[in-house]
Amino acid sequence: MTSSVRLAFLATLLLLLPLEAQIQQANSANVNQNVGQQDTGTLFTGTGTNLYYGVNLVPFGPEVGDQEVNPGLLTAGQTIDLHMYFPFYGGLYNYSTLSVNGYIGFATVLDQGPTLNVGPDMTDWPRHEDPAMIAPYLCKQQIPQNLNPGMRSGVFYRLMMRQSLFGRQTGSNMNMGQATYQSSFFGQSASKACPGTPDSYVRCDSQADYFLEEMQRWLIEGVAGAAAFRADAALVVTWYNTASAISGRSDIDSGQLATYQAIWLTDRTARLSYVILNYDRLGFDAADFRQNSRSGRCQALFNGGNHTGLVPVDPTQDFKNTPKVLAQRSGVPQMVRGRYMFRVDDVVRPAGCSNKTGGTYPMLIYPNIVNMLGEMTVDVNAICLDKSQTYILMIEQRQTATCTVLTSAIARCNLPKIFDWGTKTVYFQPQSGGANDEKAFVGYIYFVPPTLDPMRLDIGNVYDWFKNPLPYTTMPLVWYPRNFTNPEMTQHMDQVRMNDDTLYSTQLGLYVIAYREYKDDTIKKFRPEHRVICRLATYSNRNTYEYRWKPQEERINLYQVEQWYMNDWERQNDLYHYRFGYLKLAPLKTNQEQNPQQLLSGLVSSPISLHFLWTSNNPQFATTTYSQQDESARTEYVKKKSLEMCHDWYDEDGAQWNFIRDTETNSSCPCIERQAIADIGRFMPHPRCSQAFRDITCTTSIGSRNCYMSSQNVMTTYAGDGRQYNENLARFPTHYGQVCCYDDQGHLMQTSYQPVIKVTPEVPYNPGFPMRAYEFGTAPYMGQYEVPGLSAFHNDYMPYFLCCKFADFRCQMFYWRRPSSGCQEYQPPAYGEVMGAGTFNTIDNDKFIFNEPGVYNGLYIPHTLSTPEVKVQIRMERYPNRRVDFSLLGRYMAQQDLVQPTNATVVTGVVLEATGTDRVHVVARKDTRRFRYRTSIIVGNILRYFDTMRIQRFKGVMIYVNNVERGQPEIYVVLEEAQIGIRVRESYAIDIDRLSEYQESMGILNIAVSVPPQYGVRPDGDKTREQEIRQRYNLPRVSGVFRPFPDQSSGSYLNTLTLNDVNSETYRQQIINMYRVQGSGEPGSDQNINNQGNNYGMPTENMFTTSRDEDKKFEVFPEAQMKSGPIFKTSPKYETGAYRFYPMTGQVLNQRLQTCRDMQQNTNINMQPLQSQLTGEYGQTQCPDNPSSIIQDCGDSVPCLYDYYNFNAKLLGLNVKNEWNTFTSDRFDASRQYNSCGVINIEYPEYLMKTSSMSSAYLQGDVARFECFQSHWIYGVHEYKCGIVVDRNQRNIIDPRDYRFEWNKGEQPWCRSREKQNFLTWLAIIGGIFGVLVFVILIFLCCWIVKQKKKGEAAERRGYDMASRSSMTGSRGGKKYPIHESEPLNEKRFDADTYRDDDFYPPAREEQYAARNEDLHGLKTSV
């Protein structure tokens, strides 16, 4: 009776199946409703709330549009077209191979033996295949052929794509938020498929849009940062009721079957990619029978292929014991069992949560680039969370962050302020600490300054905020609403879901935070202060569907303040102590008014000027309308206050240490731009003013073609008493920085000339100036001058705007405090490069071509008291023969023959470190992996990305990327303390997108090295006094492949590169024995162990395959494998025997080129069949395709001849020719010693101009002429020439060491207006005339006085004579002549003044005549 009842029930059930399918199609409200409602104990298909699908599977099968893998291709796999590119593990794939063996593959899988082996540790690639694959359950399986009538089995697949990919509006015919899934796709013909996709497994209708939306909701629930991902396509593959490869009917009947699913999602740009794995049930552990798991063990993994790396789905001990545990556990326990999520686009990162306790498990943190100001939140995927416990995020060397459990897979942690720039290792653990075993979860967060934060608040054009008047009364404000959640709802996440739109409904306040560095009397120090001064506006965070990925755009009313947090007195006084500030958008708090200085987590903007707030509280500007007069009044008020603040800054800065002595002495600017380009270790392109980097938003130096700044804090040394001239003291960092700007001629621009050149504000002449606060900050990034970006704005940038932009006629005051460098103390670096196929120009100017595979010590500098230890290693590999046709694989060619090496080696990787720094690897990516990134930058075993931040700072290392060309092909690495820098260019930084014959770049690295002069390396290569100088100044021995002969002079520094320098045995073995790391060459090349290199302490560690102790915890990260192995790995067949490497010398190269050219151009060769056959074989193996073109295109360029011949690529040959010519020319200019007189200090620049205004006026031989405008006259010495001045001692003997370069002496030029000059001229004329008159009068007076004096003297003498005569008359009875007579011919003239005596009267006129006649006739008179 019981059996008959069972049969009746089964028959009824079978009859209800079609009806149930119709119900399922008509009402799909129950589809996926088990999410978050997992039935207890439900482990198998058909026993949950859905009759057909498991509790965790998406709908599959023919009724939803799936196609089934062809039974004849189940084992080998059926290849399908994806119709767009999907990224996976660094590669891009538009196809996939689906196999019954539980994988989605992208290459042929070697399936011999019981176990499918993949990955670096299990395969012998390239001798055997190592395919890339997504393997939910990799082991040998089968589709049972003899199933009972009630059971189905197969591998199903479909491709879901958005309608918008085909020009249709997404969601135009669907109701989001409701379950409208309809299974009406079955039987669709190819003609009705998506446009351009003839396969019927492709869906691009409303059902596909709905499915992709559902997958996004799943990802948001389980993956940190998935809210930023928008799925546009998905590949769904379902393995339904597969059985073990070795299984019988009894095994199948007993339920030893497996059902699982893989969903691979990507966006339309193929940038992001996620995989969701669903395990419904797993009935076997291996491809064995009778539940035996000793053979053909099943694996769940992601393999990058070609030894790129392997990531297991579950790296726990439970999985090793039994892989079936995947169906019982989950990476998202809050959703359903058996579900795991991964991000797989570039490197596979596990998402969701894990139950791993010991060892190391990488956390997924979003965002992992965080503003150092803190007060932000990050989402963390780590351990599977329990809401009853408290979890913390421990930050290396900093305080912990409190975390809130959002779901069982995601925790949200509130970060404090972390004043640091660089990577901090973080650990995620329960609060109970040592009471638990969860110590495995390790991650990293990169803290950045606010000026470089890629997630900063978008406030429009930042430079509009620094204009007076502001160009607009409102400014834009843009943010993504999904970055904010309701702070009240986050405390009750057990009641809401992550994809609930109400979670993102909140009120946001826009706050102004002012910054200054002030004296804190409590700690007796100056420290930074961040003060919330007001709230400008309040906005509602939009949470509707369209704002999931669409940004919210609002406007900021600049002259309206919603709430002040300063009283009236503070607004009138303290507000002007804050030179600048920034905006922060954060959710409102209920008690915001009681504690306004504490804000919730939010987004901050770039620094802005606060001058728009100066008039917001002023009553004279409190008008309801805005007019032109109001704008002018505001502008004048800002000018007035800026003038006061400029003077305050001038006085404040003048009271501080004169840092110019440090910047000019220890970081003097390069004299010409080519020196700045070559000096990689000390100077770098300015992040906002560089033509080469295509960023010229430099408002403080408009007019300069390129600006460069010191790539580290200015290093200085002890300068006190007791220092000897030959002492080489240790250097220590300051908090200063140097900025050098160059004009279009490559000459330095000078601040002293700015007032005489910049006639109007629009004249493009704004030189660079040194900075008291280095823009990139100073470790430990905590105190005054040390906050990156903010300290620079407070001490340097904002004073420039106050004095030079806002106030009038105060720019010279600023430049008095910030004078530019005159390059008088600059010494050029030693500069070398390796390019192409091993063409070297060393740092001491030796030139040669060296080829030999292996890892070499490129540069080694031992540690001294004054310099750190520096280690640079390069990896050279044999370049593959690109004439190999990959399409022959599997027919005429084996896997090991795909990579056939040539006899030319290229650099494929470089690694460097110094004392106390992180270890940095820059390696080229493998073939077929260079689509998005052409190189990999690995710091401390962690792969770093430079998509949003092209300047990144690590421990003692600065790395920046020129992202003009796609794929980060140009990387700069600077060791800060050592001041040694390298430049890495992949494939000459060619724009591969424009080359139709190349699908990806070539994988060749060019390495340029710059060594500063403190190491004693002469750039000209003269080593005559090398030993003497090294001993006298205690200099280290600099050696390596970039300086292979430090103790001997090769003489090649005086010559150019010739064919005799190509793999010459005179230096080959010396380089190999001295600098190659043991064990890194080809097999058999290290038979004779040579310790010659160890005599000088050369490193023996291979830094590509080893890790430092502090980095070993990250060795489990998949990128650790990317740096270890070669990128052009060959099979052992090509490393021994006739295929092993042998160097080609210049003579052999020349002979083969001549032979091949003769074979190409000699028509008689083809006339003899036997000779034609022999020459054909020779030409195929030894000749390039067009040898005559090589000789013609290359000419006498040896690097071009060598690379063109070996690579058989004209593009590479011509590029190395151009690179070599450019390098030699630039090196000659960069290594010269330029003599500088500095600049002429102009103190009174009114109406003065320089002729020619932009010409160089600081180098030896330069002439500077100054003139006045036509309204003024010039005075002083107005022509100067820079020349050498030799000092002579007292014996007039010239000392050749005692000289200097100076301008000629003279009074400074100055101008006087013509009106004033005319006035003074007329005044001088009038004064002259008046002076002449006065002079004449004075002369007359002098003469009159003299005359009167003489008259007086005459009168006295006459009175004496009269007295004498009177006495003589009285004694003798009279004179010779009577008194009334005179001497003959000397008639005495009548003088009234003479005869004033009352007793004497002159005689009558007649008596006088009578007397005269008497005298004439009576005396003997002689005339």
From Swiss-Prot:
Residues 1364-1401 are annotated as: Disordered. PROSITE patterns: AMOP, NIDO. Residues 184-347 form the NIDO domain. The chain crosses the membrane at residues 1322-1342. The keyword Glycoprotein applies. InterPro entries: AMOP_dom, DUF7658, Epithelial_Barrier/Signaling, F54D1_6-like_C, F54D1_6-like_Ig-like, F54D1_6-like_Ig-like_2, NIDO_dom. Residues 29-1321 are extracellular. Disulfide bonds: none annotated. This is Uncharacterized protein F54D1.6. It comes from Caenorhabditis elegans. Residues 638-818 form the AMOP domain. Residues 1343-1423 are cytoplasmic. Residues 1378-1401 have a biased composition (Basic and acidic residues). Pfam families: AMOP, DUF7658, F54D1_6_C, Ig_F54D1_6, Ig_F54D1_6_2, NIDO.
